Design a protein with these regions (language model features):
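Structured C-terminal subdomain patch of bacterial secreted/periplasmic proteins
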Residues: 231-264, 272
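Hydrophobic alpha-helical segments of integral membrane proteins
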Residues: 1-9, 57, 61-65, 241-248
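Hydrophobic alpha-helical transmembrane segments of polytopic
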Residues: 22, 41, 45-48, 242
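Membrane-interface helix-boundary motifs at transmembrane edges
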Residues: 30-38
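A structural signal for short, hydrophobic/glycine-enriched beta-strand patches
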Residues: 46, 51-237, 309
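Compositionally biased, proline/threonine/alanine/serine-rich low-complexity intrinsically disordered stretches
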Residues: 264-309
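Membrane-embedded alpha-helical segments of integral membrane proteins
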Residues: 1-30
């Protein structure tokens, strides 16, 4: 039920839709002679669009989330790489049979890079179809085609195709992967999406190492107008509002323990300070080895593995 309510609520309040609804309402009430109310709602509609498309509001809202989890030094050993869905054009791929990526496609490209760095690591992809009315191919269905093209064998993949949102991503993966206590799993998702994702994994007692990708801000936008293409600014604002609403809603229903989970909220993460599992400090020699990247060192020319039949 919460899934359907969240989709309906978001459809109503996302900036572009809300502006259209307010404009339609202003025209309707004006027809009944309530011109002052109609004028106020029309003004509200204009302000929503202007702030969303012509200012840096979206970047200012999104940047704190992107900066929450800096990328740590590469761990020496990795048991698996988790990739959360949201990187493919589902409707296009369903119609054309390809693997077209969207702005979140960095998730899967980075996963392929990590797959080369850690050749023994499993790659767990989670992503079904999370829309109410639009048809599309789930990311976990499309991902094997892209990975095969990039030289990642199908035998390394763990595919979770049923989840519709981040909460279901985590719950389904926890049951499917069943990680061992001493294993290290990298979590690859968009930087702005990392706080909510890590909060869910912590709640599920599934320790992960945050590996953020797909940054949408430079961190230098500042307060101003016309700092980006209006269409991109509108998309950034929409993304930021959606993520903040998601964080607040998940905290309200108890799915995460804080509104904006961070690296210092709990142990079980490998961070830039060299903290190991359980929050213990690594000895200086081990910490230096970790920061050198272990398996992340240069491995010479790339020789793609054979794709499994």
């Amino acid at each position: 039920m919460l899934f359907y309510l969240s989709k309906i609520f978001w459809f109503l309040i996302q900036p572009l839709n809300l502006a259209i609804f307010l404009l339609a309402f202003s025209m309707l009430v004006a027809l009944f002679g309530w011109r002052k109310l109609g004028g106020l709602t029309a003004l509200a509609s204009f302000l929503i669009l202007a702030l969303s498309a012509w200012t840096s509001l979206g970047a200012l809202m999104l940047n704190p989330l992107e900066e929450r989890f800096p990328r740590p030094p590469p761990p020496d050993e990795v048991a698996g790489i988790i990739v959360l869905g949201g990187g493919f054009e589902g409707a296009i791929n369903l119609a054309r049979g390809g693997y077209d990526v969207n702005r979140g496609g960095d998730r899967f490209l980075e996963a392929a890079v990590l797959a080369r760095r850690y050749p023994d690591a499993k790659i767990a992809v989670s992503g079904g179809t999370g829309t109410l009315v639009l048809n599309g191919e789930g990311d976990a269905v499309t991902a094997p085609k892209l990975f095969a093209a990039l030289g990642v064998p199908a035998s390394r993949l763990i595919l979770e195709t049923k989840s519709r949102n981040t909460y279901e991503n985590v719950e389904n993966l926890r049951q499917l992967v069943a990680p061992e206590p001493d294993e290290t799993w990298l979590l690859v998702t968009s930087a702005f999406h990392m706080p909510r994702s890590v909060g869910l994994f912590r709640k599920a007692a599934f320790p992960v190492v945050a590996w953020p990708v797909d940054y949408r801000t430079s961190g230098k936008e500042g307060i101003g107008v016309m700092r980006d293409n209006p269409a991109d600014s509108l998309q950034t604002t929409t993304m930021a509002i959606r993520e903040w609403f998601g964080l607040i809603a998940y905290k309200f229903v108890g799915r995460i323990d804080s509104v904006v989970p961070g690296p210092d909220d709990a142990s079980g993460l490998v961070g830039q300070d060299g903290a190991a599992r359980g929050g213990e400090e690594l000895p200086p020699d081990q910490n230096a080895q970790q920061q050198q990247g272990g398996q992340g060192e240069d491995q010479g020319p790339y020789e793609p593995p054979k794709v499994a039949d």
